[in-house]
């Protein structure tokens, strides 16, 4: 019997457009190896071409192409993606974090006559300084969150207010544009993503303990700027307010009990009637409007005399911008008690330029305080 001839395997050849090499845009790149008989060490492959594993990391899974050489040996080319390492710790993106969020019900024991106010201020994500960079700032903030949560576990409240007092990102277009270009460790888009993830973490944590009210003010580092000039509507075209809009969408999607506040599009601040009884009128403003901390009470008086709706009715005003803690009794309030100005602490990487000029620095923290329904505020704060 004659055996039938076997059909030879189809010869596989290298793709016509196959070009081994590396393409890199300064942030991310794609590497394509030449044909190899065994899988290479991709880190070594990059190192041989000037991309150190200490500075670059491989992302995703490699793709392969195979073909048969003239001598019958099979070769494999590997195509993989890599990127420049960021100093940021591994935070999930905002939407990935949201997908893991389940609606929570506050613990049953609530004191409806008490509110806890959390004032994250001047995170300036992306900034580098004597206290480190973004990685260290995030670690500082998360440590503050942990201490705040320990307080909430021990103290029941009927509501929690989160006031983003501004400058949550460093940006690249404040008055220190050139220094920011040199010193920042994240792009504006990366800054926004990291800051949103941080504020989302705070919102999620707080919602476990009580219904939440959350607001963001307009601020100088978050302003929409062109050639150094503010453009657009200040209470709308602001990165901090854009972040809050995204948090509102996510909170609505996952069912968190949160009410959100932003300024009027043509203003930069807002006021909340904390217990909806006309007693505690809590205002938030970044503070850059006053230029210097000593000018804040005067600016507040001017806004009140001019009947500016953003803060004129406030019994308590919280500001940031000046990177230190300060408490000042500032006249009489509509409720029969005192007006109080609270200057919130910063959590940033350090304002070394100011320390060089003034010889002063302040310790980072998140400023918090407690309000009681129908009870005058007496100026007591907590720093976490």
Predicted regions and their residues:
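Short, solvent-exposed loop/turn segments at secondary-structure boundaries
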Residues: 130-132, 228-229, 354-356
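Beta-strand-turn-beta hairpins that frame and shape the catalytic cleft
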Residues: 108-118, 271-283, 336-339
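Active-site metal-binding loops of divalent metal-dependent hydrolases
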Residues: 121-123, 166-169, 218-224, 286-289, ...
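Acidic, histidine-bearing metal-coordination/catalytic regions of metal-dependent phosphoesterases
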Residues: 1-119, 124-135, 154-156, 208
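Core catalytic region of metal-dependent phosphoesterases/phosphodiesterases
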Residues: 106, 110-116, 120, 134-247
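Conserved beta-sheet core of the metallophosphoesterase superfamily
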Residues: 29, 233-241, 248-257, 262-266, ...
């Amino acid at each position: 019997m004659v055996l039938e001839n076997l059909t030879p395997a189809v010869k596989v050849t290298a793709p016509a457009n196959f070009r081994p090499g590396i393409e890199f845009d300064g942030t991310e790149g794609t590497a394509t190896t030449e044909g190899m008989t065994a899988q290479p060490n991709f880190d070594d492959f990059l190192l041989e071409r000037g991309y150190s594993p200490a500075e670059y990391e491989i992302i995703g899974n490699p793709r392969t192409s195979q073909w048969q050489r003239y001598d019958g040996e099979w070769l494999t080319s590997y195509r993989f993606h890599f990127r420049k390492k960021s100093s940021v710790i591994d935070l999930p993106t905002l939407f990935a974090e949201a997908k893991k969020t389940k609606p929570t019900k506050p613990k049953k024991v609530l004191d409806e006559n008490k509110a806890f106010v959390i004032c994250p201020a001047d995170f300036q994500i992306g900034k580098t300084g004597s206290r480190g960079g973004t990685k260290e700032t995030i670690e500082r903030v998360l440590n503050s969150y942990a201490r705040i949560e320990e307080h909430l576990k021990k103290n029941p409240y009927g509501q929690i207010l989160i006031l983003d007092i501004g400058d949550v990102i460093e940006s690249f277009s404040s008055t220190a544009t050139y220094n920011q270009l040199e010193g920042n460790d994240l792009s504006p888009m990366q800054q926004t993503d990291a800051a949103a993830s941080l504020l989302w973490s705070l919102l999620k944590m707080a919602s476990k303990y009580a219904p939440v009210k959350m607001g963001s003010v307009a601020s100088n580092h978050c302003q929409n700027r062109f050639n150094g000039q503010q453009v657009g509507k200040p209470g709308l075209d602001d990165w901090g307010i854009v972040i809050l809009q995204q948090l509102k969408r996510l909170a609505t999607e996952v069912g968190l009990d949160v009410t959100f506040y932003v300024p009027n599009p043509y203003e930069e601040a807002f006021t909340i009637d904390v217990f909806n009884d006309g007693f505690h009128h809590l205002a938030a403003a970044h503070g850059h409007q006053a230029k210097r901390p000593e000018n804040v009470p005067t600016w507040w008086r001017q806004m009140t005399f001019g009947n500016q709706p953003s803060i004129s009715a406030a019994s308590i005003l919280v500001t940031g911008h000046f990177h230190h803690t300060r408490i000042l009794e500032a006249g009489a309030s509509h409720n029969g008690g005192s007006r109080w100005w609270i200057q919130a602490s910063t959590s940033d990487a350090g304002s070394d330029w100011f320390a060089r000029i003034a010889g002063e620095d302040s310790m980072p923290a998140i400023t918090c305080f407690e309000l009681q329904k129908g009870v005058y505020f007496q100026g007591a704060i907590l720093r976490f």
